[in-house]
Amino acid sequence: MHPDVQDAFDIARRDFRSCITEHGILAGRHHLNFYKARNAMFASLGANSMGEFTASWKSIELFLSMQRDDGLIPHRITSKLKPHYHHLVTEPLDGNALVIIALRDYLDKANDLQFIEKNFKSAKKAIEWLRGHDTDRDLLLEEPFFAGWQETILKSGKVLYSNCLYFKALKDFAVLANAVGEEKVSEEYERLARRVSEQINSKFWQGNYYCDWIGAIKHDSFSTDGNVLAALFGIADREQSQMIQNKIRQHQLNKVPLQANYPMYPFWRIPPGLLAVDAYNYHNGSSWFWIGCLNSIALSNMGLRKEAKQELKTIARLIKENGSVHEVFLHGKPIKSVFLKSEPFYSWNSALFLKAVNEV
């Protein structure tokens, strides 16, 4: 292992473990001192890669224990264990997809079938809740504003990121169903996953990348989150995945792996109240290590191991330079303003860096 990567690995492991509590995985240890579904579920993938299975299953169990009767899991749970199901006025979609993905990964790594059997009914409710958000019955999910991870950007309709997670959740639920002896259910969800993948390619593919989202019109900005997930999950074939990597290099989005989008979203895509607190760049032209780490795994899966390792070295040097695994970067530095500061001990990034180093 490269010395910079080893040093960064040690820092990331320290930061990640500092976010583990008796209840699960916190989003961070400073101003993000709470449990957030997308953060915890993505972080559980890193926990599993490290053999930290207790942190993984406790995080999954925490959110499923507070699942609403209709199947929605909490968006956020406070440090005092009070659940919140909305972001502003919206019920985010990705937590429900990610809890299924986390369950499948936990089964694969920990081989704990008993835990899956215990939570299968809750998983089924979670995936059925997601299916209910295909409002126009075209197999793709529709969402209102603020329902995905880019909570400061006004997007609505069919969003690439959410639909890639939906595809993966359908595939993984099919595996869970088969594991508990529900073969017919497994076959149903495997078929549905294939059809969703076909629809993503039909609706989103632009010839050399997937568009960002489809509302009243098609928004053809390049979002690295969904494009990387499409390559990682096998929605994109080998040729498409290479085109996505070409697009990333063309716009130098891997200088700080990985810049979230290109080009910049216009100012009117950010709610005015957030502009007032310096949030213009929070999800707009900024860089997030979790996307870079998943991209390094995607590159490795494509056989581009040299490029994958280089991406990890770039991330590692920034981790060493800052002495911790920060949340979000702009122009090579952690975001820091009067109102907005990057979380310095960010579990989502640190856990996926650990996963990427273990797999690349």
Task: Mark where each language-model region is.
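Beta-strand-rich domains and repeat architectures in extracellular enzymes and scaffolds
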Residues: 33-41
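An active-site-proximal structural segment forming one wall of the substrate-binding cleft
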Residues: 119-134
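Short coil/turn segments at secondary-structure boundaries
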Residues: 31, 47-51, 83-94, 110, ...
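Well-ordered alpha-helical scaffold segments within catalytic/enzyme domains
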Residues: 1, 41-53, 98-115, 165-183, ...
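Active-site neighborhood of glycoside hydrolase catalytic domains
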Residues: 161-203
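Extended glycan-interaction surfaces of carbohydrate-active proteins
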Residues: 1-34, 58-91, 132-158, 195-288, ...
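Alpha-helical positions within canonical tetratricopeptide repeat
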Residues: 55, 115-118, 122, 185-188, ...
